[in-house]
Amino acid sequence: MLTSAFRLVFGVALVMLTLLGHAAPSAAVSLEASPMGVLPFNLAGDRPTNLGVKEGKLAPCPTSPNCVISQGDEDAEHAIAPLAYSGDPAQAIAKLTAIVKAMPRTTIIESTDSYLYAEFASKLLGFVDDVEFYLDPAESVIQVRSASRLGQSDLGVNRQRVEAIRQELSV
């Protein structure tokens, strides 16, 4: 336990020194990868391998509370309503893509006529959330899944993001 506490304190001290400019990075690294510059650890996490639409469904949420999804029999903590759209499905996915592209620190990873996958990075430490949208022809809605890669709590960020997108899409 003492070792874990020491590692945590040492890690925080190292980050603070790096951010204040008193510690030199140990290797040449692109500063574009993290909004905070060179950190001694990766806060983006690895891209999940279970993303995408399989048999008309997005992947279920993990048990951690930092995920929301509109499909499946999710508990209230994870459940969120799908996105409604009116008119042509192609126009709806195009409008959704434009909304997502306009959001800060967003990278679109995959885009088709019925699926959109984007990564959103947090402003301060560069934590990455994976957000997927699936234009569900059977339900005439856009199913959504938004999940943080790391940690337990997201302080409601994934739910807030989906609700902001819902509001923009309805305009």
Each predicted region: which residue ranges?
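Bacterial N-terminal signal peptides that target proteins for export
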Residues: M1-V12
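C-terminal segment of classical bacterial N-terminal signal peptides
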Residues: V15-P25
